[in-house]
Amino acid sequence: MRILNVSLLVLTAFLVDFVECGRDFYKILGVSKNANANQIKKAYRKQAKELHPDRNPDDEMANEKFQDLSAAYEVLSDKEKRAMYDRHGEEGVAKMGGGGGGGHDPFSSFFGDFFGGGGGNGGDEGTPKGADVTIDLFVTLEEAYNGHFVEIKRKKAVYKQTSGTRQCNCRHEMRTEQMGQGRFQMFQVKVCDECPNVKLVQENKVLEVEVEVGADEGHTQIFHGEGEPHIEGDPGDLKFKIRIQKHPRFLISVTGIEIIELKVDELVELLLEGIRFERKGDDLYTNVTISLQDALNGFEMEILHLDGHMVKVQRDKVTWPGARLRKKDEGMPSMENNNKKGMLIVTFDVEFPKTELTDEQKAQIIEILQQQGIKPRAYNGL
């Protein structure tokens, strides 16, 4: 009997803890408990597109999942609410006065009016639409490699109902008027409906633009219904076109040398030591300058990549000027499949010594290289 009572107490305590814990927001979003803000945003955005009620109007289960998803994002995207949730669960967040209810729909900050009112997503063909707005969004190569979210604050012009009425839906109609016996005249008149009056106001809007992992130059992110308003129809779309900036130099680290962050204004003389990536499709290209000594004897070095990891480059044979080394899966991630990456292609330049050699050193080089049989020859190198 005592064993049974103890078991019931344990079970009751477990159920109480389970109820107090509430929903597992990390599980709902499909992220780990140490996920960063960008990972949380990306997870929400991916699921919200599929579960939004306007896309699943008759699916009650999808609607419930979307409510849970919105509640999870509302809490985990807020630092204070997330900290409270991590300590005391959903009940703790509710006690602090907000969040977790699922009533807030952050969907529009990622997509605009994605489904409602036509919004550029298949509205009535006869419905007039405001002009689309296209904005160039300049991002770094690091942001395109790793993925990024850019918060855009803007003022949006919208029409709001006000007092009075106005003429609307105006069109031309043909009328017939009898001029006399057997005589008629046809003429065109302008006919309008009476609609509630509206005025143009400015609203503050915050949009989250996702720079997807592996984003391509020219890729466009569309926010439906966030463009120019139309007094008798739907607003146009707001489009952000990705423009990838030329990559600045980054540092290399020969084994045993600590990587330092250079300040350009203080260390201008070291500019030639910097390396930058150039992107072509999903491949990355860079040039590395090595000494003649390393070109002949071999070398080992590391290149700092766009996400902070080091790429080891090693040669144990002669490296000639213009030689290329290809590193598989060290290029850009594919936008369609982030698990696939292009090549990193390293081209080597060789820096020759600037000091003059003594006669003895020249004789030693001749003896070592044994290239007496190779004569200078001219060719068209253009």
From Swiss-Prot:
Transmembrane segments: none annotated. PROSITE patterns: DNAJ_1 (PS00636), DNAJ_2 (PS50076). Residues 1-21 form the signal peptide. InterPro entries: DnaJ-B11-like, DnaJ_C, DnaJ_domain, DnaJ_domain_CS, HSP40/DnaJ_pept-bd, J_dom_sf. GO terms for cellular component: endoplasmic reticulum. The keyword Transmembrane helix does not apply. Keywords: Chaperone, Signal. It comes from the Eukaryota. This is DnaJ homolog dnj-20. The gene is dnj-20. Residues 24-89 form the J domain. Pfam families: DnaJ (PF00226), DnaJ_C (PF01556). GO terms for biological process: protein folding; protein maturation. GO terms for molecular function: misfolded protein binding; unfolded protein binding.
